[in-house]
Amino acid sequence: MKKRIQKLTALLLFGSLTVSLLTGCGGGNSGSSGGDGSSSSEESSESSGGAGEVTLWHYFEHEAPDLEAIVEKYNEEQDKIHITATYVSREELMNQYTIGAVSGELPDIGMVDSPDMASYVSLGVFEDITDDVGSWEDLDQFYPGPLLSCQDADGKYYGLPNNSSCLTLACNMDILKKAGFNEPPTTWDEFRKVCEKTTNASDGVYGFAMCAIGTEEGTFQLLPWICSAGGNIDTLDSPESIKGIQFLTDLVQDGLMSKEVINWQQSEAYNSFCAGKAAMLESGTWQLADIDEKINGTFEYQYALLPKDEEYSSTIGGENFGVCTGTEYRDECVDFLKYLMNAQNNADFTAAAAKLPVRKDAVSLNELFTTDERYAVFNEGMNYARARGPHAQWPTLSEAFYTAVQQSLLGEKSAEDAMKDAAATIDPIVAEDPLPEASIGGGVADDVN
């Protein structure tokens, strides 16, 4: 009980500080939310006859119509339940889960950012559906990385993954070529040289833009830099992890990356790149949805893997859906999850949302994943992408990490001292409850190359 209370307290604090995460979580603008931060799909106002009323909460914004189309089709194809899909901002949704863990006021089906699922499972937000999906013949079609995020330490399932994403390097090739570089950098040394040659302080142009904000969004983008050097979040005081953060700190301190990165969400770093104010960007899969529209032909761009030190690295993003504790329609909700994540729906939804499928058999069902060279880079990046957790106290681990990185970037502490201080928080937690072996690679590239 003491551990449960500690986790609940941590999540309450975490939820109050969380901002909308685009990383692997969708993004864009939505005019559909009401004054309370939520909105229901249009079909909610229609008569559902004698079907049981089921609520589904999600924080998809520009992807909402694609999700609602699947929900509407499911409602038409069966008469046991009628699902109402309701948009709730990510921050509010996480708060509602935390409160609902105590009050019991939860939706029937809920969406969650993949690294957060273990935390809410530990609080009892999601139902154990192992008996329903463990023997499901489709389960072996799911990539191991995303699927791992739906399991607890004992291998029990509490949901199904809906989509994946990862991070790569977007390059303004006009700026790079003008500086004498015809190809994107592949190593840290090359990357540093490109940053030096492309930064133009008088024009407000930096060599690199990324998100290092003090939220999970920052952790999402920061992790590849320590992992590429051979570190990880459970070895922050190692020379490898310190090296990764020192590399980023030097970029800021040397004026090659704006100090504003500590305040930027991924969307703001993205906007800076699209406006021609950064030669390179740490970019997420979902940004493929509107990059051409934003750039509007003002410059040539190209995607590449994030530059490496010892090895290539990226971070897995994405969302999961789970059946919430206490629903009257448990079996029906599980049936919908299987429907939502069938091969065709997974292919259609992820293609429309500029994300990556979580199923191997979905890749060949939409030509976008096999013919678009930009997707090919992200698909390759999935082979090096690491899952965040899963861990019941991931919010605590993440906060310790991004807080320390910000202190280093701003020069408040040395990279070494900052990482050692973060390790002092993280090490006792993972000593008692270790992280699982890193799940690397979604396998998507193997199916399209």
Q: What positions do the PLM features span?
A:
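Short, low-complexity disordered leader/linker segments with a strong preference
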Residues: 1-55, 76, 370, 427-449
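Hinge/lid segment of periplasmic solute-binding proteins
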Residues: 113-167, 192, 200-203, 218-221, ...
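Periplasmic solute-binding protein
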Residues: 117-125, 130, 144-183, 211-233, ...
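Extracytoplasmic "Venus flytrap"/periplasmic binding protein-like
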Residues: 73-142, 149, 174-186, 279-280, ...
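Short, well-ordered beta-strand elements
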Residues: 49-61, 81-86, 108-109, 158, ...
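Extracytoplasmic/periplasmic substrate-recognition and gating elements
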Residues: 72, 76-77, 177-179, 246, ...
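Glycine-centered hinge/linker elements that transmit conformational signals in sensory
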Residues: 194-197, 201, 234-262, 306
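Long, aromatic- and glycine/proline-rich binding clefts that accommodate carbohydrate-like moieties
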Residues: 150, 301-304, 351-403, 407, ...
